[in-house]
Amino acid sequence: MTPPLAAPAFLASAGWGGADILPVAGDASFRRYFRVVDGGRSAILMDAPPPHEDPRPFLAVARWLTRNGFAAPAILHEDLAQGLVLLEDFGDVRLRETVDAEPARELGLYGVAVDLLVQLHDAEAGVDAPYDLAVYQREAALFVEWYCPAVGLEVDTAAYRDAWDAVLAPLLAGHRPVTVLRDYHAENLMLIDGGEGLGLLDFQDALAGHPAYDLVSLLQDARRDVPEATELAMRDRYRAATGAGEAFDMAYHVLGAQRNAKILGIFTRLWKRDGKPRYPALCPRVWRYLERDLAHPALKPVADWFAANVPPEKRGDPMQVAA
């Protein structure tokens, strides 16, 4: 992965001239990341090239998080016109690899992640754009736009939308909006402060929405098997800390189903449109989460649609079940 041509001049203007620029594994977007090393110090260079990417939402949310006591990377230098940002380096120790290597730490570290959400949700929302019904519907539609055609299914898209309207509209009435980071999972949580704290990444798409969403993102992780016992214990921990009642469990499953349907569409799009074939293999896990969520009585309209439109043999890795 070659650094952007403007990187050396940008780094020189930030006081990092002559530093080594090393690639860092990226995400599912057009953004790219590089570690900048200069002697004993390091930083992260974000390349968010326009017009595909805009670093301003990331910068705004990062500054809000920092002002409110959360660990977002410090912004060291920026050039918005070129989409370049120099950030504090949180290192390489992610929650994902830590708990995979040390299962005994899973409950404790997931507890830290849940407690962070409790604190985040106690604050007033730090973004204005709402996570409303239109956004939820647009996201859920990715399933019928990408997954279904990829596996050879012709489905009733109008009934799909109606089913989501039926389950989402009651949920979205009457809750206090909180900051929803939207990709709050084990690969975006960095161990900092000697492994006692968590640093936040990949929050540029934050919206003001339902508090259950990021808990779903953490506990129904598309990239990692979270044991069901851990999921239940962490939901109980969140409810105990916030006083959330039975309605929260309903919201958890509704938003879990919506998120997982969206992810199935996104992972298929990453394969079909963006040429990233590693994502379909993650879909069987996402299907397991989705089917578990659909079993909740509040999801009956959506569950009925899936039963009528997506047969069991078409639920899995789209590269495999398309044949």
Indicate residue ranges for each PLM-predicted region.
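Conserved NTP-binding catalytic cores of kinases and kinase-like/nucleotidyltransferase enzymes
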Residues: M1-L84, V178, I192-G199, A307-A323
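An alpha-helical support segment within catalytic cores of ATP-dependent transferases
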Residues: A7, A12, A125-V135, E139-V180, ...
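Active-site acidic catalytic loop and adjacent metal/ATP-binding pocket
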Residues: P23, F30-V37, L45, I75, ...
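ATP-binding pocket architecture of kinase catalytic cores
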Residues: R31-A134, L142, P149, L153, ...
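Hydrophobic packing residues in well-ordered alpha-helices of helical domains and bundles
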Residues: F58, E106-A113, Y136, T157-W164, ...
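Active-site activation/catalytic loop segments of kinase-like enzymes and analogous catalytic loops
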Residues: L142-A150, P211-A244, A257-D274, V286-L294
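Acidic, serine/threonine- and proline-rich low-complexity regulatory regions
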Residues: A244-V254
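ATP/Mg2+ or Mg2+-diphosphate-binding catalytic cores
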Residues: G265-A323
